Amino acid sequence: MSTGRSTGATAGSAAGTRRPARPPAEPVKSLPCARPSTDWNEVVASRRPAVEGYTSIDSAVPGTDVGLYISATAARYRIQAYRMGYYGHAQACLVWTSAWQAGRVQQRVKVVGATNTPTAPWSKSMTMATKGWDPGVYLLRIDGGSRTARTFMPLVMRSPSFAGRTVLVMPDTTWQAYNSWGGYSLYDGPRHSFKNRSRAVPFDRPYDARTGAADLIPYELPFVALAEKIGIPLGYASDVDLQRFPTAFLRAHAIISVGHDEYYSPTMRETLTTARDHGVNLAFFGGNDVYRKIRFANTANGADRLEINYKDATDPIKTPSLVTTQWRETPSNNPESSLTGADYRCASSVYYPMVVADPTNWLFTGTGVQAGTKLPGVVGQEFDGINIARPVPRPLTVLFHSPVICTHRPTSQDSTYYTTPSGAGVLDIGAYYWNCAIARRCPAKIDGATSDIVTRITTNFLTAAAAGPLGKRHPAVDNVRTYYPRPRVGN
């Protein structure tokens, strides 16, 4: 493992690489929209919102009637549905506005059973028709009449077919795992107690991320907008769709895990593995992906609306295929790296630069980078790395190899790309802040040169992956031994 200091220059610095070449200056058509919106995000975050709600289903094909469950201390409210993406200077299109409804306060939270499951056992407030809507990622804004009385509900309008498309998958199982509405998440309970955490969290409750939008705005929306701007054929799905419709993904050209995508059921993981083995390209544009193992159960609102994860041996289900310890742990013993390429390395509160390892790789075309070029601030929070003591698909190319200090130990972040006999190419960016770097809206300051490079690499991958199996045109060249001549000790 290389832990030495890189001598490469920072992206765009005078002492090193030139600023990356920009994409061709061709006019890019924005998606048609009668009512593009630049004020969709005029929402004041609140720990006690005047309006909040959730949908009866997290993902549905256009034409589905969607139940809305709303609680409001505001005297009245309305729903405004925004399709999110690329609309020129706007990232939202207003597609529907409800009539004003009388506000009604519903029960705050009901915590159920030994699993500490926090539910919102609310009556349905209204039904929203979606006939004629386009597939895509939506935010439903609950408007209580002022900027301080607004929150969101995320919704995916699933594509009726994924054939020939690059499918953007929203990480709603991870959104839900971290959602602490009602005082419980899969991480903690009251007073931030890990011991009293929930072991089963339902989709039948609002998201508590201050605005109700989970992580969609900072970590998924920049990627969605860029993918739409590029103009490739896109499909849209949620994580739970990988569980419900596994065969629907087999005719896609690529499946993209957008953002932090940590929580996977056996069926979800098998859906991606089978698609890869049928020549479907995969990419993980986040870090810490496919790390936690979950299973689903039903709620009163439907199938697969309860997400179960114990994280330890207290799981009462002992069947190896269902027990919810980590994927790499007993009894699963199936590290995420066998699918993703790298695996979860560490969580850090310090921001580090990504360091270019192989600038000759096709993904760096047009970036102007050199070996050792640094992308400041992109490595942080959670990130991935290679451990050759675990299953690592080969041939595998290390694209970035970035020295990091985490939990007081030197280690490394790695971004990887491998190809398979089926022709599929699989990319693992392995960095939590990659997508927010596209829009320069990360916790760390992202400079323009770094954002340009991140955007160009993302564009290169999406454009090539949309054309079919990457391994036939861009086979991976193995360079793992350059950076890992011997197995690494520890996680």
Question: PLM features: residue spans?
Answer:
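Loop/turn elements at helix/coil->beta-strand transitions in domains of secreted/extracellular proteins
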Residues: 135-136, 161-167, 229-235, 250-254, ...
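Proline/serine/threonine-rich low-complexity linkers at boundaries of modular beta-sandwich domains
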Residues: 23-50
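Helical hinge/lid and interdomain linker segments adjacent to catalytic or ligand-binding clefts
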Residues: 107-119, 125-129, 133, 212-298, ...
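Ligand-binding face of N-terminal immunoglobulin V-set domains in extracellular IgSF glycoproteins
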Residues: 52-157
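An acidic, glycine-rich "communication" segment
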Residues: 290-408
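Aromatic-Pro/Gly-enriched surface loop or interdomain linker
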Residues: 72-86, 92-99, 147-248, 469-472, ...
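Extracellular low-complexity, Gly/Ser/Thr-rich intrinsically disordered linkers
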Residues: 227-229, 242, 370-489
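Solvent-exposed loop/turn segments at secondary-structure junctions
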Residues: 162, 172-176, 241-244, 260-264, ...
